[in-house]
Amino acid sequence: MRDKIKLVSTAGTGHFYTTTKNKKTTPDKLEMKKFDPKVRKHVMYREDKIK
């Protein structure tokens, strides 16, 4: 089953993306570079729980 996750910007702007991931195939936390429109740059985004 795919679970919903939140990808939070490491730039400290509070911007986030929501996506899904399969926890069986990727048990570790996701990290990827995505565009942060608040700083207008590509920065690292880390997985966080959706509350």
Curated annotation (Swiss-Prot):
Alphabetical list of InterPro entries matching this protein: Ribosomal_bL33 (IPR001705), Ribosomal_bL33_CS (IPR018264), Ribosomal_bL33_sf (IPR038584), Ribosomal_zn-bd (IPR011332)
PROSITE patterns: RIBOSOMAL_L33
UniProt GO MF annotations: structural constituent of ribosome
Keyword Ribonucleoprotein among UniProt keywords: yes
Family according to the record: Belongs to the bacterial ribosomal protein bL33 family.
NCBIfam families to which the protein is assigned, alphabetical: PRK00504.1, PRK00595.1, rpmG_bact
Name of the molecule in the record: Large ribosomal subunit protein bL33
